[in-house]
Amino acid sequence: MDHSRRTLPGVSAPADGPDPDPAPDPDPDPFAGWARRLYRPLEALHIVGYFAEETTQAYLGIGLTDYGMGYFASRSAAMGPVRPEVTTATFYVFSAPLVAAVLPRAWGLASPEDIVDARLRGIEAALRRGLGDAADSAEVAEAAELAGQALVGLETAGRPLAAAHLGLPVPSTPLLALWHAITVLREYRGDGHLAALVLAGLDPVESLVTAVAGGGPAKFLKSTRGWSPEQWAAGQTRLRNRGLLDDDNSFTDAGQAVRGTVEHRTDAAAAAPWRRLGEPGCARLLELARPLSRTIAASGILPARLAGPDPS
């Protein structure tokens, strides 16, 4: 197995890289604020599956050939045996040839149902390694209950990845029920983020370029999303021509404003489940999630660049 591919996704919502902290919104929705505050500690629990050996081994065990296939197939499997064009569209920032290298071939090696099951087995093993005794704690059970409440009656029109994952059965154990709810919530946020990128007129490459301009990891994003240096440079040129980047490919004031608007719209579009949970529930879930995410970070299961402390 090629372990160098194990850093392929690094997919934290937004999918184009770490989200920059935007300037304060002049009239913030409090639940948009909760969406932002809850995102990072919950994301630390979700993304364990993208980096843990346990999930990779689970995919290899059902016949998938490598880490990259496991990533694209496992995140797509909730939608069924979709064509690569569907995954490319819903994941947004990965090049079409990169996705087409593993889909639909993966569906001939394992069914989407078997891939979903393998993902859960790998996730459970990884979370148990990362959390230790906390995996079976009352805090995990309470967090699962709260995160699940945020999903009750959730409208997913226009949110294909969130809808697909919401349609999966809720696992019976609190640990996996928590991961399932977090996954629906992060895909819900991600679907809204992609809409914000489209509304801002940022195509997949331009989305990545602006993520780098906002402080995202340039080497990592350039090497894992499947775009050529020429395609990347062309994206930079388009953004300079729009006045969003300067000659050093850093943000102009206009570029910073556009990216800040994307982040504000992402938070606003992610607010609905947290509004359902209510402020006391949001505050309690944040109180529960932060120690769990710090335990995961301290376990060494995540790459160092993703294991920093979550913001207050």
Q: What residue ranges belong to the model's regions?
A:
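Accessory, usually C-terminal, subdomains that scaffold auxiliary metal cofactors
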Residues: 225-303, 310
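Phosphate/adenylate-binding glycine loop and adjacent helical scaffold
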Residues: 2-233, 304-312
